[in-house]
């Protein structure tokens, strides 16, 4: 069961009477609870941008204890001098016999001033271990397996073909439902993700607000040792407290985790000719101070009909002002016949040329242009700043050092 509607002002209580009926912070909360506000923006942001929630919890967060440096860090050094070459990786993870939870299985791929990209692998649930990111919100894009995200606000269920966003500062733990789970993760330290403007598309289309789902209140009333790991100022810290931090019995507000089924995306595409720009596939965006230039765009290339006439239908050859990190959830990407499979990654930074490989080009340039259904799901994390690759990703054996060879079959066919 979920609450529906992107950015709505929701309210939920796991125990009847836990929510104050007429105010935020009564002198004495019912059921012996404590009132606590969680702010996602400054107090004086305009009303339509203002994010906050009131939580009614068994113990306030100030009782969590002292944080100390954690034994390892997920943030990794970035390559100092990065070439303008296109880069691609095969999937980083194989199945592991070693127990690995979500935090232990994070792999830092690349970063920019406001955004970081990771992959995750986990085959072991976080039972009495919790995570919070004070540096930004987290966007989950799974490509195999099923996980449940137990948060301060309630539970989200997540599997391939869906996404979830955990806001900055919200504590959660990952329960692995399948044998193992793998996915992509994007950390956004800019403005919170929101729905893109639709412009001439009109009032409807792309990701519809009604399809975003928020959790109903659920809580853990457990005592004993509970470890909280917190990412703060690019470092990991930990504390051990004597109770679960997921002790919120009721909440109301518009700052909360949410999930979304990507199959509900209302795809807009051409019904005449030419390949539209990929911005029409934007699901969520983090706006910058420059209109139309985003800190982060989350873009998908979902299952869709291709019907353009007298047109080269795959994505065109391109040199972009923006910086692209792509992944594949399932299927075969229509611009890459080989080498780009689910779990793979490609990075094409500003002005780095990219486009269909030779084999894909040859097929698309000569095929009979009947209506064709593409049954795949690729995505892109697009940023205004360069993706700086981490040293560990650059040296990883899954990096395809021969990636550029996929374009070497093209020949000069010009004739006068």
UniProtKB/Swiss-Prot annotation:
Its cofactor is Fe cation. It catalyses: homogentisate + O2 = 4-maleylacetoacetate + H(+). One of its GO terms (cellular component) is cytoplasm. GO terms for biological process: L-phenylalanine catabolic process; tyrosine catabolic process. It is an enzyme of class 1 (oxidoreductase). It comes from the Bacteria. Gene3D superfamilies: Jelly Rolls. Pathway: Amino-acid degradation; L-phenylalanine degradation; acetoacetate and fumarate from L-phenylalanine: step 4/6. It holds the Pfam family HgmA_C. GO terms for molecular function: homogentisate 1,2-dioxygenase activity; iron ion binding. Homogentisate binds at residues 333, 354. InterPro entries: HgmA_C, HgmA_N, Homogentis_dOase, Homogentis_dOase_bac, RmlC-like_jellyroll, RmlC_Cupin_sf. The active site is at 275 (proton acceptor). Fe cation binds at residues 318, 324, 354. Hexamer; dimer of trimers. Belongs to the homogentisate dioxygenase family. Involved in the catabolism of homogentisate (2,5-dihydroxyphenylacetate or 2,5-OH-PhAc), a central intermediate in the degradation of phenylalanine and tyrosine. Catalyzes the oxidative ring cleavage of the aromatic ring of homogentisate to yield maleylacetoacetate. PANTHER family: HOMOGENTISATE 1,2-DIOXYGENASE. This is Homogentisate 1,2-dioxygenase. It comes from Legionella pneumophila (strain Lens). The lineage of its organism: Bacteria, Pseudomonadati, Pseudomonadota, Gammaproteobacteria, Legionellales. The gene is hmgA.
């Amino acid at each position: 069961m979920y609450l529906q509607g992107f950015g709505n002002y929701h309210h939920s209580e796991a125990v009847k009477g836990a929510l104050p009926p007429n105010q935020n912070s009564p002198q004495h909360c019912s059921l012996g609870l404590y009132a606590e506000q969680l702010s996602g923006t400054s107090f004086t942001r305009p009303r339509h941008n203002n994010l906050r929630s009131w939580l009614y919890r068994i113990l306030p967060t100030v009782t969590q204890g002292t944080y100390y440096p954690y034994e390892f860090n997920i943030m990794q050094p970035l390559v100092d001098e990065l070439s303008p070459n296109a880069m691609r990786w095969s999937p980083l993870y194989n199945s592991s016999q070693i127990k690995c939870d979500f935090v232990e299985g994070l792999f830092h791929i690349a970063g920019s001033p406001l955004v970081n990209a990771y992959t995750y692998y986990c085959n072991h649930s976080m039972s009495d271990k919790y995570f919070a990111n004070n540096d930004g919100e987290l966007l989950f894009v799974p490509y195999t397996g099923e996980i449940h995200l137990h948060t301060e606000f309630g539970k989200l269920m997540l599997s391939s073909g869906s996404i979830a966003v955990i806001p900055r500062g919200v504590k959660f733990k990952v329960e692995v439902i399948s044998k193992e789970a793998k996915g992509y993760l994007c950390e956004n330290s800019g403005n919170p993700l929101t729905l893109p403007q639709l412009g001439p598309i009109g009032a409807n289309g792309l990701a519809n607000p009604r399809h975003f789902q928020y959790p109903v209140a659920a809580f853990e009333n457990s005592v004993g040792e509970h470890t909280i790991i917190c990412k703060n100022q690019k470092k990991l810290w930990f504390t051990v407290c004597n109770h679960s931090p997921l002790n919120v019995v009721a909440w109301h507000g518009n700052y909360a985790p949410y999930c979304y089924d990507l199959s509900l995306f209302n795809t807009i595409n051409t019904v005449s000719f030419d390949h539209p720009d990929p911005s029409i596939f934007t699901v969520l965006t983090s706006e910058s101070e420059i209109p139309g230039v985003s800190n982060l765009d989350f873009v998908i290339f979902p299952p869709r009909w291709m019907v353009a006439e007298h047109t080269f239908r795959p994505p065109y050859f391109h040199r972009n002002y923006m910086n692209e990190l792509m992944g594949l959830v399932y299927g075969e990407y229509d611009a890459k016949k080989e080498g780009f499979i689910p779990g793979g990654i490609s990075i094409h930074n500003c002005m780095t040329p990219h486009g269909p490989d030779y084999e894909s080009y040859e097929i698309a340039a000569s095929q009979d242009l009947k209506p064709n259904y593409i049954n795949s799901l690729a995505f892109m994390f697009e940023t205004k700043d360069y993706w700086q690759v981490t040293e560990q990703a650059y040296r990883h054996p899954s990096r395809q050092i021969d990636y550029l060879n996929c374009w070497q079959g093209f020949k000069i066919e010009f004739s006068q």
